[in-house]
Each structure stands twice: as C-alpha cells, then as structure tokens.
Amino acid sequence: QGFNPHLYMTFPLPLALGVESLREAVDFRLVQQMDFQRVADEMAAVLPPGFGVVEVAAPVMPASAIAWAEYEIRLAYPEQEREAMLFALKGLFDKPSIDVVKKTKKGETLTDIRPHAALLDCKTDENGLWMWVRLAAGSTLNISPQLLLEAFQKNTRPADSVKILRTAILDAERKPFA
C-alpha cells in the first residue's frame, strides 16, 4: 500500500458510449469486512442522481466467463419506412455472413459477425423499428451493437434516432453473469 493506496475496481464489461443499461456489474475490493447492505447504502449515498445500487454480492463468476450480451435497440423511422426497414433487418440476419470493418488497436480488419450475432425478436410500432439481439461479448470477442447497426445501415438509411439498451450480460451457457 505505501503512502498511495490503490483502488481495486473493475467493470467486467464496460458500456460503450451512447449505450444504456438496466444493470451493470462492478468488482471492487474492500479493505475491511462490511455487511453488504451497508456497502449498498454507502455507495448509494454518493452516486450521482439517477444511479442506484441494485444489489451487492460476492462475485460468483470471473470476468472471463462473460460470453454474450443482449440488447434492445430502437431505431426511429417515419411510419412509411418502418415495414421496409423490418424487412431489411430480417434479410440481414438471413444472410450467411455479415461482414463489417472492425477497428482494433492493431488496425482495421474485415470481420464476419454473423456467427456471433442472433436476432431474438423484432417488430415495428409507433416508435419505430425494435430489435432484440444477442451479441458476443467479453474479453476474447466483443461485437458492439454499433457494429451491427453499421452493417444494417450499409443498405438502408441511418435512423432518425437510435436508442440502445443492454438488457443482460451472460456466460457461455447463456446464464446471467453474477
């Protein structure tokens, strides 16, 4: 420790800029034994408005267990375009491959994200086009929802607005990360 103690805190799957989440995991070390309810109360007292503590628990899985993330994505389109966009979305997932340019620290690579992306559901309503997807996530392979949207918008026009909500973080067996 010395004169400058270091904080141990990690976010196993940090959110990308512009993505919301129902629940986020954070792993941190305490320097003394504390009741979980006290930890939750003390954290909640110093969080910014709009943030809350859902649960405090001992870690069950290592961060390396994360394999998937599920998202709810809403794309705003005018009413007259929604059915065509729904058709285009289903067509994208009917393809055997979905090639995108993925940017990494080593440069850009052409990547087929189709084996690592599943369309769970989709629909249109008065708010636009909705899709629920499962994408590979974690330390070995991470497919961002923005990459999927780039692939979708290659052959369509950009949405008037986009809302991305991460709804779950899952392990390889698709069990909730804990």
Task: Please provide the spans of the model-predicted regions.
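Short, charge-patterned binding micro-sites
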Residues: 2-31, 60-63
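Internal, conserved structured core segments that host functional sites
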Residues: 51-94
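Short amphipathic beta-strand starts and helix->beta connectors
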Residues: 6-15, 50-59, 110-123
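Extended, solvent-exposed, turn-rich assembly/linker loops in the middle of proteins
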Residues: 26, 37-47, 55, 72
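Core RNA-modification/binding signature centered on pseudouridine synthases
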Residues: 95-178
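A generic structural signal for short beta-strands and their flanking turns/coil linkers
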Residues: 5-7, 22-26, 49, 67-69, ...
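Short amphipathic alpha-helices in soluble, non-transmembrane regions
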Residues: 38-47, 84-94, 147-149
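Short beta-strand-to-loop capping motifs
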Residues: 28-34, 73-79, 133-137
